[in-house]
C-alpha cells in the first residue's frame, strides 16, 4: 500500500500530502523522525537497513525513525517508528533540537529524540537486517569505514562525537549525558559552590563572547547545560588562532567587578589561594629539584600571580576547546574562572599549541612583550600542579613525570 505522507514547506508547516512513492520520486520535502537509543552503559544502538528500503538501502544507521504520515503528529510518528523498527515501547523520550536535511535523494524536517533502553531489541524484518550496541568512540571510528546514512551522520553525528569525548573521570566533578543535557555532579563538597557559581556567571557572560559557552542551570545533583557540539582541539590552524584571539579579547574586556559579583572568584580570594599553592610548592616541590634548579625555581614562583586585572578562564587548553567543521564549537569547563592575569589564558596558545595557532592569535589579540613573558612563566608553572597533586594523592609516577617537565621548562 502506497501510504500518504505529510508534505512540509520551507518553514516546516504542513502544506499538503502525497503518496510515498511520489514523495520519493520527486524528492518532496516532508517530515521524518530519528531516535538515538542508548543503554545504561552509554552505548548506542546501531543497525543496518535491509536492501529493500526505498532510500539508502543496506546502509548502516544509528537512529530509529521514518516518515511522518499525513495527518500524524510528529511525536506520534516518533513513538510508532521506534516500536516498529526496534520493538522499543514505553520509554521516556528526550527531545533534541529539530533539524533540516536535503540531498539528491531526500529532503525533510527532522524531529529528533534520544532515549535510554536496556531491554531487548526486536527488529522489524522488512526494515532492519542486523543490529548491535556500540560505544560512541567505536561508532565514531566507523564513520569513515562503514557506509552510513548521510542524513543521520549530518543530523546526529555531532552529538555522537560529543558523547565520545565525554568521560566521568574529572578531578572536580563527574559528568554524564541525558539526551542533549550534560550533567555535572561535584566529587567533593568544596566544588559545589564553584559549579553553582557558573549558573550565575555564564548567563551574563555568554552574550558578550563571540563563541558558544555552556550556560548551566542548577539541578538536585549539581548543574546541567545543553551539550556543545564538537571535539577537543587536536589540529591547529591560523584561523582557529584568530577565533581564539577574538574570544580572549572579548573575555578579558568584560567588567571584572561585575564578573566577580556574578560568581567569578574575586582577585583577593584567587590571590590568597595562589599564595597557599606557591608556598606549598616552595616547601614541598623545590627541595625535590636538583640544587642548581632551586634559584630559578624560586624566582619563577616569585614572579607569577602578580597581576590580576581581568576575568580569565584559567584552564584554557586543547581539552577545553571544542572544534566543529574547522571552527570553534565551544569553550567549556569554567569552574576555575577568576579575576586574574590575562597572560594565564595565553600560556598554552603561545607556548604549546599546534602550529599556526600563535600566529593567528597575534592577529586578533594585542600581545605585548611583557604579556608574552608572563605567559611563558605560566607555561613554566604548569607542571608544578601535577607534582603538587601527585604529592597530595600519593602518585609517585605523576611526581616523577612532573619534576622532569619542570626542569625542562625552567
What are these regions (language model features)?
Residues 1-34, 40:
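Acidic, metal-coordinating catalytic segment for phosphate/diphosphate chemistry
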Residues 163-272, 306:
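ATP-binding pocket architecture of kinase catalytic cores
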Residues 19-21, 58, 95-162, 388:
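Nudix hydrolase/Nudix homology domain
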Residues 167, 171-178, 183, 298-344:
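Active-site acidic catalytic loop and adjacent metal/ATP-binding pocket
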Residues 45-46, 63-95:
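The catalytic Nudix box helix
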Residues 246, 264-303:
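Active-site catalytic-loop/activation-segment of kinase and kinase-like phosphoryl-transfer enzymes
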Residues 89-97, 212-217:
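A short coil-to-beta-strand element that immediately follows conserved catalytic motifs
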Residues 233, 336-342, 347-410:
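Helix-rich C-terminal or lid/interface subdomains of diverse kinases
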Amino acid at each position: 500500500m502506497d501510504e500518504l505522507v505529510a508534505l512540509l514547506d520551507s518553514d516546516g508547516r504542513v502544506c499538503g500530502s502525497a503518496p510515498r512513492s511520489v514523495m520519493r520520486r520527486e524528492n518532496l520535502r516532508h517530515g521524518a523522525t530519528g531516535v538515538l537509543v542508548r543503554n545504561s552503559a552509554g552505548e548506542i544502538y546501531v543497525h543496518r537497513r535491509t536492501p529493500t528500503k526505498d532510500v539508502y538501502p543496506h546502509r548502516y544507521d544509528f537512529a530509529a525513525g521514518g516518515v511522518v504520515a499525513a495527518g500524524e503528529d510528529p511525536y506520534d510518528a516518533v513513538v510508532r517508528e521506534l516500536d516498529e523498527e526496534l520493538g522499543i515501547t514505553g520509554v521516556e523520550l528526550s527531545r533534541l533540537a529539530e533539524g533540516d536535511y536535503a540531498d539528491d535523494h531526500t529532503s525533510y524536517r527532522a524531529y529528533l529524540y534520544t532515549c535510554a533502553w536496556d531491554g531487548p531489541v526486536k527488529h522489524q524484518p522488512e526494515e532492519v537486517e542486523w543490529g548491535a550496541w556500540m560505544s560512541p568512540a567505536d561508532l565514531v571510528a566507523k564513520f569513515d569505514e562503514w557506509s552510513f546514512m548521510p542524513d543521520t551522520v549530518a543530523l546526529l553525528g555531532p552529538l555522537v562525537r560529543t558523547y565520545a569525548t565525554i568521560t566521568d573521570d574529572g578531578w572536580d566533578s563527574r559528568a554524564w549525558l541525558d539526551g542533549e543535557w550534560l550533567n555535572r555532579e561535584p566529587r567533593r563538597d568544596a566544588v559545589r559552590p564553584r559549579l553553582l557559581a557558573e549558573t550565575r556567571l555564564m548567563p551574563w557572560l555568554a552574550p558578550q563572547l563571540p563563541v558558544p559557552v555552556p550556560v548551566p542551570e542548577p539541578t538536585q545533583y549539581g548543574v546541567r547545560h545543553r551539550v556543545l557540539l564538537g571535539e577537543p582541539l587536536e589540529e591547529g590552524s591560523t584561523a582557529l588562532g584568530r577565533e581564539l584571539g577574538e574570544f580572549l579579547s572579548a573575555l578579558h574586556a568584560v567588567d571584572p567587578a561585575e564578573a566577580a559579583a556574578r560568581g567569578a572568584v574575586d582577585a583577593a580570594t584567587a590571590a590568597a589561594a595562589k599564595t597557599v599553592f606557591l608556598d606549598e610548592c616552595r616547601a614541598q616541590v623545590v627541595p625535590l629539584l636538583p640544587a642548581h634548579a632551586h634559584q630559578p625555581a624560586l624566582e619563577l614562583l616569585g614572579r607569577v600571580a602578580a597581576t590580576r586585572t581581568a576575568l580569565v578562564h584559567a584552564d584554557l587548553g586543547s581539552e577545553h576547546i571544542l572544534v566543529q567543521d574547522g571552527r570553534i564549537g565551544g569553550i567549556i569547563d569554567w569552574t576555575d574562572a577568576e579575576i586574574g592575569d590575562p597572560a594565564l589564558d595565553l600560556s598554552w596558545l603561545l607556548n604549546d599549541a599546534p602550529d599556526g595557532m600563535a600566529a593567528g592569535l597575534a592577529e586578533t589579540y594585542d600581545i605585548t612583550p611583557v604579556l608574552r613573558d608572563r605567559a611563558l612563566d605560566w607555561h613554566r608553572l604548569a607542571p608544578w600542579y601535577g607534582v603538587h597533586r601527585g604529592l597530595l594523592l600519593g602518585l609517585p609516577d605523576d611526581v616523577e613525570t612532573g619534576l622532569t617537565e619542570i626542569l625542562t621548562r625552567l
